[in-house]
Amino acid sequence: MAHPMATHPRLQRRHGARSGSSRCRHRRPVPRRRSRSRPRWRAARAHRRHHRRSGPGIGDHPADRARHRRGGRLPAQPRRAAARRPDPRGGANTDHHAAPRHRRAAAGTSHRRRDRLASNDSQHHAHPTATGPRPRTTVRRRRQPRITHPVGTADHRTRTALRRPRPADQLSAALRSALEETRRLSGLADQLLTLARADRPESHPSAKAVPITPLLHESVARFAATGADITTRAEPDLFVSIDPDHLRRILTAVLDNAITHGDGEIAVTAHARDGAVDIGVRDHGPGFADHFLPVAFDRFTRADTARGGRGSGLGLAIVAALTTTHGGHANATNHPDGGAELRITLPTPRPPFHEELPRITSSDTKDPNREHDTSDQ
């Protein structure tokens, strides 16, 4: 017999009782309790997100997981304070794990950039280059503007002249300017080729006994035709051991340097001294700056602050390279009476060898014993 309260309509509507139901009608059913733990798939997804965001943590390594399955203990968890970084603005420390995701990412990026800059700065201080030889990258950085500037200038002026119709005088001026830059580029290419050949011993031409006086007067006459005031004083019958083309380049470079940066009269001297010939070129300009003298013969180096100009910085470098190739040396100084002075020392040719004596063969010699035997007969 059913409980009398179980047949009440309100209780039946509340508990969902039905006629013929097997549910116990006198007891209120207990609802299922919802679990507070997340589903496994959701926990795995959160773990993967954290792993991608912060990298593998303690216990994530396969060896740690295997140790945990065997009942072993995982390594000790780091303290939360270890994850706190000092605030670069001088404020309180920032807990990156407690901050939102976008702030954590921004803070991590800034710290990584700061660490990278600090590492680069420490490497720079650990390997200084100011006291050692200049690296090749420095030479390349100096070389690039010298090569690209004439090309860019000629290209720009030519395109500007052809952009729209212009009067004949403006077009002629633009073309003359482009031609000047083209000549500068051609001269720069020639200088670079000369330096490249000087660096290769197998490409050096054979040295000859060259009289210096005719070539010196030839170079001086070529520059004097442009209006330069040059005086020459050279001893007669001076010979140097060098290639004639290299000697012309050396004389042209030192005279061009004196005319470009000097002022007034230019004095050229040549005399013999200690088995060599000393060539001196002195101008009456402001002279070399003290800081420029140690690097006067370096490539792509110019004393712009002291002597101004638009040179390529290769003239004196070519002089030093060609002089050293033939066993000489170059020196740059300031004259005591004012002005800059360049001195080139070149070796004199070796004295000619004596003529070889005729070789004595066996047929020319006579056996004294044989002569004695013949006389006896």
Curated annotation (Swiss-Prot):
Its EC number is 2.7.13.3. Keywords: ATP-binding, Kinase, Nucleotide-binding, Phosphoprotein, Transferase, Two-component regulatory system. InterPro entries: 2C_sensor_his_kinase, HATPase_C_sf, His_kinase_dom, Sig_transdc_His_kin-like_C. CDD domains: HATPase (cd00075). One of its GO terms (molecular function) is protein histidine kinase activity. It catalyses: ATP + protein L-histidine = ADP + protein N-phospho-L-histidine. Residues 84-98, 352-377 have a biased composition (Basic and acidic residues). GO terms for biological process: phosphorelay signal transduction system. It comes from the Bacteria. SUPFAM superfamilies: ATPase domain of HSP90 chaperone/DNA topoisomerase II/histidine kinase. Residues 1-169, 346-377 are annotated as: Disordered. Autophosphorylated. It holds the Pfam family HATPase_c. It is an enzyme of class 2 (transferase). Residues 10-54, 99-115, 137-146 have a biased composition (Basic residues). Residues 146-350 form the Histidine kinase domain. The modification Phosphohistidine is found at residue 149. Member of the two-component system HK/TcrA. Phosphorylates TcrA. HK is composed of two separate proteins (HK1 and HK2) with a distinct N-terminal sequence in strain ATCC 25618 / H37Rv. This is Probable sensor histidine kinase HK.
